Amino acid sequence: MDNRPIGFLDSGVGGLTVARELMRQLPHEEIVYIGDSARAPYGPRPAEQIREYTWQLVNFLLTKNVKMIVFACNTATAVVWEEVKEKLDIPVLGVILPGASAAIKATQTGKVGVLGTAMTIQSDIYREKIQALSPETQVDSLACPKFAPLVESNSHQSSLAKKVVYETLRPLVGQVDTLVLGCTHYPLLRPIIQNAMGKDVKLIDSGAECARDISVLLNYFQINRSRTEKDIQHRFYTTASPAAFKEIAESWMGIDIHVEHVEL
């Protein structure tokens, strides 16, 4: 047993989609979440800058005595997850491999689409992971640089969001039967994405798949939180406005939370 919290990092609020799923699946686990909304989105930034910022988030979580770190950000996973995983002596989980594995299981036609930030798509990491597991699977990747800002600005339910999503996804409509939401911000746009792609297209939430893998790792390393420990205090931190973060988080997660501002 290990009653220390699980650390989550993201460029902003997108990783809340992973945290929410973990809280649903493992309600007895405690989380510490840091979202770097002041510098979001990470997708358009140079790889070295993403690496620097991500290490700052990692080091912040380490000061909170976490037992595991979850990269709840596809861009950070693509750029620096392997490096962090090798250097830390606690488990470090990324969102890309779980999403890639789920896509292979879901597709019936062998045609998978991947949505992501400019950096995630440029890295080609989803194609690499999917085709390493299933070489015959065709992967069509599409950068969606306007999606994460819609979520960070709490505009993901607006008419503008619908317009942007429909225009962006047009090249993929009718081309794939499975679509990976390769950025943890994108599940907040899920209803619009589903409507744009059609009801028969399977959407893969890489963050939700990641949450399932967290449970497996906790069991493997025997670091589950004691189920008799009732004093659970989730902690949320942001580099931007706590009020803005709190508004999005509470509407998405359906719970009251306390958010603190931090400078990195």
UniProtKB/Swiss-Prot annotation:
GO biological process: cell wall organization; peptidoglycan biosynthetic process; regulation of cell shape
Pathway per the UniProt entry: Cell wall biogenesis; peptidoglycan biosynthesis
UniProt keyword list: Cell shape, Cell wall biogenesis/degradation, Isomerase, Peptidoglycan synthesis
Binding site for substrate: D10, S11, Y42, G43, N74, T75, T184, H185
InterPro entries for this protein: Asp/Glu/hydantoin_racemase, Asp/Glu_race, Asp/Glu_racemase_AS_2, Glu_race
Active site location: C73 (proton donor/acceptor), C183 (proton donor/acceptor)
Function of the protein: Provides the (R)-glutamate required for cell wall biosynthesis.
The protein's name: Glutamate racemase
Organism for this UniProt entry: Streptococcus suis (strain 05ZYH33)
